[in-house]
């Protein structure tokens, strides 16, 4: 028999998280699982994100907290503007009825992310408790949305957490082709304009890898986090000039 993984600690409300080294490893049943329990309130979420921990659980499960190793991140200078996305983005920018908005419809965005069908996932981890928790985090000024609007309709977007000069991506949705990717491009432009070098993507997916995200050691991620999470946070607003950070800095890649 193989070695049994370390028991997962159950946290009472307000209890501190265990050291990240206590998280289950890559050969355990649930790599990255660190703890269960605690509360999904604003102070707990801020403490968690400040240490490189995030909640992720399905309906009917307790709150589960994760810190995977390796960690999937997008270095903002490595964002891949594929030729097809560049074409979609230029078309979007040329249409006066298309625009990017920040934080105008946060709850609509998170609920749209929850209902977005995803390959290999029969349900969603954005359960009602998570919607409520991140809506509270949004009202407190830490959770934000990037929204793609076309002719007055919300057609795509993402939501994230921002602490200092760290951005933690959470989920995306699209009701039109490339709508979520355009939102991500806007976020990357914002980050580049404000010297935010890394967007946390949490876990590896083929979709994120295709856009330039890659895995790094958790220790490197936590080191970068510690250096940036306490820095002065830039105002959460989008300026059209940020597109220059994308269109002039990027050479389009195939396809």
From Swiss-Prot:
GO BP term (any one): protein catabolic process
Protein name (record): Leucyl/phenylalanyl-tRNA--protein transferase
Class of this enzyme: transferase
Reported function: Functions in the N-end rule pathway of protein degradation where it conjugates Leu, Phe and, less efficiently, Met from aminoacyl-tRNAs to the N-termini of proteins containing an N-terminal arginine or lysine.
Keywords: Acyltransferase, Cytoplasm, Transferase
Family: Belongs to the L/F-transferase family.
Signal sequence, renumbered to the chain: none
Catalyzed reactions: N-terminal L-lysyl-[protein] + L-leucyl-tRNA(Leu) = N-terminal L-leucyl-L-lysyl-[protein] + tRNA(Leu) + H(+); N-terminal L-arginyl-[protein] + L-leucyl-tRNA(Leu) = N-terminal L-leucyl-L-arginyl-[protein] + tRNA(Leu) + H(+); L-phenylalanyl-tRNA(Phe) + an N-terminal L-alpha-aminoacyl-[protein] = an N-terminal L-phenylalanyl-L-alpha-aminoacyl-[protein] + tRNA(Phe)
Matching NCBIfam families: aat (TIGR00667)
GO molecular function: leucyl-tRNA--protein transferase activity
One term under GO cellular component: cytoplasm
E.C. number(s) listed in UniProt: 2.3.2.6
Location(s), subcellular: Cytoplasm
Highest taxon, organism lineage: Bacteria
Pfam families assigned: Leu_Phe_trans (PF03588)
């Amino acid at each position: 028999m193989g070695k049994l993984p370390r028991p997962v600690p159950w946290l009472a409300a307000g209890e501190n998280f265990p050291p990240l080294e206590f998280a289950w490893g890559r050969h355990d049943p649930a790599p990255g699982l660190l703890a269960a329990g605690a509360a999904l309130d604003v102070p707990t979420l801020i403490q968690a994100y400040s240490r490189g921990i995030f909640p992720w659980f399905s309906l009917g499960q307790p709150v589960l907290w994760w810190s995977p190793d390796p960690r999937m991140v997008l270095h903002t200078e490595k964002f891949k503007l594929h030729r097809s996305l560049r074409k979609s983005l230029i078309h979007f920018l040329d249409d006066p009825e298309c625009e990017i908005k920040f934080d105008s419809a946060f709850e609509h965005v998170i609920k749209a992310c929850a209902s977005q069908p995803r390959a290999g996932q029969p349900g969603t981890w954005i359960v009602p408790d998570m919607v409520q928790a991140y809506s509270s985090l949004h009202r407190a000024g830490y959770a934000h949305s990037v929204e793609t609007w076309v002719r007055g309709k919300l057609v795509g977007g993402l939501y994230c957490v921002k602490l200092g000069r760290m951005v933690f991506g959470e989920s995306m949705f699209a009701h039109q082709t490339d709508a979520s990717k355009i939102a991500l491009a806007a976020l990357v432009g914002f980050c580049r304009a404000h010297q935010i070098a890394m967007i946390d993507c949490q876990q590896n997916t083929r979709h994120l890898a295709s856009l330039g995200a890659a895995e790094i050691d958790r220790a490197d991620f936590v080191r970068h986090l510690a250096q940036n999470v306490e820095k002065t946070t830039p105002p959460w607003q989008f300026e059209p000039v940020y597109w220059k950070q994308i269109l002039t800095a990027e050479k389009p890649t195939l396809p």
